[in-house]
Amino acid sequence: AAEQQAKVAEFVKAHDKTSYAVFILLDEAKGFVAKQDYASAENSLKQAIAQSQDDILTSLAALRLSAVQFQQGQFDAALASLNQVKSQGFSARKDLLAGDIQIAKGDVNGAKASFENAQKSGNPLEKQMAQMKLNNL
């Protein structure tokens, strides 16, 4: 495992600030999550955001980072990470995750507003998910 992490670090260094570096870091984070090593996944995702020069990749990494932080009970950090989601294509997913985090924090009104925003901007499946979450409040 340490050898693979060293190879990833070497690759990222060789491909600094490129999409290749972001993709390998996203893949590394996925592996850590599969092993339930959320702290390492968080580090990989933070590196991916730092390496990214693209709003879509930054948004994807920030969504995943927020989910990992949420998993670890870092609710404020998870909400802060969602502020890095800039791509409009991810706005409903951002709002759905924000609502889940707000519920965990006990902020039902904030969650309601987030789910209502997701209903406005989401695709049909996201809108249905937002409605289901609103019904459960």
Q: What annotation goes with each model-predicted range?
A:
Residues 16, 21-94, 98-101:
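Alpha-helical adaptor scaffolds
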Residues 54, 108-110:
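Contiguous, function-dense segments enriched for cysteine-driven chemistry
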Residues 104:
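Post-transcriptional modification and biogenesis factors for structured RNAs
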Residues 110-137:
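Terminal, low-structured helical/coil segments at or just beyond the last alpha-helical repeat
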Residues 4-8, 41, 78, 111:
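Solenoid-repeat scaffolds in large eukaryotic assemblies
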Residues 5-8, 12, 45, 82-83, ...:
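Inward-facing hydrophobic residues that define packing positions of alpha-helical scaffold repeats
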Residues 1, 8-9, 16-19:
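A positional/architectural concept
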